Amino acid sequence: EIRSRGLGDVYKRQTEYFSHADDASFDDAKPGINKIWKVLHYNVKRNGGPDFWKFRTRVAKAAEKVGNLSLHVWAGSLGGPSGHVLVGYGSEDMSGIDNESETWPKVMEAYKELFGEDSFENDQEAFNNSLEMWGNFSEIWRWLPELSSPPVAVN
């Protein structure tokens, strides 16, 4: 039996390549300790790059000041939609996803200490305006060590 394949079938098999954004990432965890990742997919407007990356790199610096965080940012470089960026926050288990309300305020406070009192609100607004209206979403990724290569530090 011969069946035609639609564009959806081709799209499902599409390979997308990403480059690690070292200056927008911070991770002081031992490689392999984090098994759960909250991954945010962002679609950055063509002219939104400067505001997007300013906020992401500053968040990484604030995360470093707070410590005990795993934050990785990957920018789409080939094969996917223009402006596709992944932002991942790692934790040992699902409790790390639940305590986001404890961790994020600490990052916000460190951001303000580093860059000025109104910096977080202003930069976050510019960041939000740098994103396409549609296509942003989040996922939970689970790392299975028994099915994976040995862990290594990314940066």
Language-model segments: which ranges?
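Short, glycine- and small/hydrophobic-rich beta-strand elements in well-ordered beta-sheets
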Residues: Y17-A21, A60-G88, D98, E117-E125
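Single conserved hydrophobic/aromatic residue that forms the stacking wall/gate
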Residues: E1-Y11
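Short, surface-exposed ligand-recognition loops at beta-strand->loop->(often short) alpha-helix junctions
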Residues: V44-W53
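Short, structured interface segments
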Residues: D9-D27
